[in-house]
């Protein structure tokens, strides 16, 4: 059991206009949903000694501030640009995740830049609000944050003591909240090689 150094991620979550519509413009409902997601993410990341703090929740209640499309790569690229040119100029944070009610093409429910944590454009992910079960959306965001933290998808040789681990390529119908040995190794390597500075400070 390796000991990981304590790290802190100041997180901004943006709910797009489709989310606003899906939840009938009820910002309290969206806020509750998002807080539950962040609580679960903290539970998942506790063994890695990473603490997430929600420093901002932005709801695009009038209109989207980027073009959100079913092509997940395009939406992620737009969101990354918007984070760099707009969000970062008015809100201090380490990472931003877009929560959208659009249906991404194919089986995709999320996308993020691998090893992007602390980079201007690439410390981002996009998450489809794909389930009425909060845990499943939280696991998707935890997975995409894993990519930002240097983790790749689990291969057959990766184990976590459950059927399926957080970084499995496909969300299992029996998902677990556990990271595989491979994910832990990837994260350790990311810390050592990239030494991301923005997650050192306690919020």
UniProtKB/Swiss-Prot annotation:
- InterPro entries xrefs: MetalloPept_cat_dom_sf, Peptidase_M12B, Reprolysin_adamalysin
Query: Which Gene3D superfamilies does the UniProt record give?
Result: Collagenase (Catalytic Domain)
Enzyme class (EC, first level): hydrolase
Query: What cofactor is this protein dependent on?
Result: Zn(2+)
Q: Name one GO biological process term.
A: proteolysis
Reaction equation(s) it catalyzes: Hydrolysis of 14-Ala-|-Leu-15 in insulin B chain and 413-Lys-|-Leu-414 in alpha-chain of fibrinogen
Activity control, as annotated, is: Is inhibited by EDTA, o-phenanthroline and tetraethylenepentamine.
Cysteine disulfide links: 118-198, 158-182, 160-165
User: For binding Zn(2+), which residues are annotated in this chain's numbering?
Assistant: 143, 147, 153
UniProt-listed PROSITE patterns: ADAM_MEPRO, ZINC_PROTEASE
GO CC, alphabetical: extracellular region; plasma membrane
Where is the protein situated, by its record's location annotation? Answer: Secreted
GO function terms (MF aspect) = metal ion binding; metalloendopeptidase activity; toxin activity
Provide the E.C. number(s) assigned to this enzyme: 3.4.24.72
Q: Which domain of life is it from?
A: Eukaryota
Domain Peptidase M12B stretches: 7-203
Q: How does it assemble?
A: Monomer.
Q: Which PANTHER family match?
A: ADAM A DISINTEGRIN AND METALLOPROTEASE DOMAIN (PTHR11905), DISINTEGRIN AND METALLOPROTEINASE DOMAIN-CONTAINING PROTEIN 28 (PTHR11905:SF32)
| Family, as annotated | Belongs to the venom metalloproteinase (M12B) family. P-I subfamily.
Query: Protein name, please?
Result: Snake venom metalloproteinase fibrolase
């Amino acid at each position: 059991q390796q000991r990981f150094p304590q790290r802190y991620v100041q997180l901004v979550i943006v709910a797009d206009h489709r989310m606003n519509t899906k939840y009938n413009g009820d910002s309290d409902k969206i806020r509750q949903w998002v807080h539950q997601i962040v609580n679960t993410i903290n539970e998942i990341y506790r063994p890695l000694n990473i603490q997430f703090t929600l420093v901002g929740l932005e709801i695009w209640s009038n209109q989207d501030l980027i073009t959100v499309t079913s092509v997940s790569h395009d939406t992620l690229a737009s969101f990354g640009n918007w984070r760099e040119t707009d969000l970062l100029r008015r809100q201090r944070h380490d990472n931003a995740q877009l929560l959208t009610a659009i249906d991404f093409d194919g089986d995709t429910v999320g996308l993020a830049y691998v090893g992007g944590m602390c980079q201007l454009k690439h410390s981002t992910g996009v998450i489809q609000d794909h389930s009425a079960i909060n845990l499943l959306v939280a696991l998707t965001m935890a997975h995409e944050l894993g990519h930002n933290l240097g983790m790749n998808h689990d291969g057959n040789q990766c184990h976590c003591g459950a059927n399926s681990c957080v970084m499995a390529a496909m969300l299992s119908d029996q998902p677990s909240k556990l990271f595989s040995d491979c994910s832990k190794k990837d994260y350790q390597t990311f810390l050592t090689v990239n030494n991301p500075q923005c997650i050192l400070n306690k919020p």
